[in-house]
């Protein structure tokens, strides 16, 4: 007996590249019909990281818009600033051009930090709900009054490694990306490293500086909209302490722990990740 496999219909054909400033175009994956869900990827990655989310979300009657940040994936890679404000402005311009309203904004890792800065600067323009997944929020590095996650000097070492042996940098993150070295199969690991190598070295380093230095604690208190925080309990890149601090910092937030996941909760527990996102976005 055979089981019929349904192919997801992505709906209308839309622009794959959007110009956010002269000579800078961002790669956009835009499919489906319904309430918009806007996906922002993490450091080193691109909108391709959400491959195992797109079909489920489109099938559940959402319009899914994956934005690849400048410097990464198939987007343009200009020299210049790569702080959170620049990325937030790029997102604003994409959503302006697409005339998006009532969106669910999803940010993974560094993408979560950029999503928080976006909402803080632009007062929630185009967006009605926020999802933070394994987010580098409110800080990625520790301070005297924030004793969590990495030392700033550890990030300096990563910046040096980026300039001297970028494949080694990617191999290091591949080893700590999941809960255990075998949580993701070798093929998935190679796929992620391939995406990572498509990033520019310049953007990779400058985004590490933004991750190292940016404090979003004052941004969090400006977020009033409903917020879903999803975070792996075994995350070695953005420790679970960050999720607890973020949950405490956003008044209207709920935290869902992924007990079996490291940083790659969207892959290690993809079914749960998609179900939680669909449930939250559909309310």
Where are the regions that the model predicts?
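Short beta-strand/loop motif that positions the catalytic acidic residue
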Residues: 223, 229-231
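Catalytic active-site module of serine/aspartate enzymes centered on a nucleophile-bearing elbow/loop
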Residues: 253-283
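Conserved HGGG/HGGXW glycine-rich cap/lid loop of the alpha/beta-hydrolase fold
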Residues: 24-80
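Flexible "cap/lid" loop of the alpha/beta hydrolase fold
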Residues: 116-121, 125-164
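Alpha/beta-hydrolase fold catalytic core
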Residues: 1-38, 59-62, 100-101, 281-283
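Conserved acidic catalytic loop of the alpha/beta-hydrolase fold
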Residues: 86-103
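Conserved alpha/beta-hydrolase catalytic His-Asp/Glu region
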Residues: 141, 145-149, 160-221
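Acidic catalytic loop of the alpha/beta-hydrolase fold
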Residues: 234-238
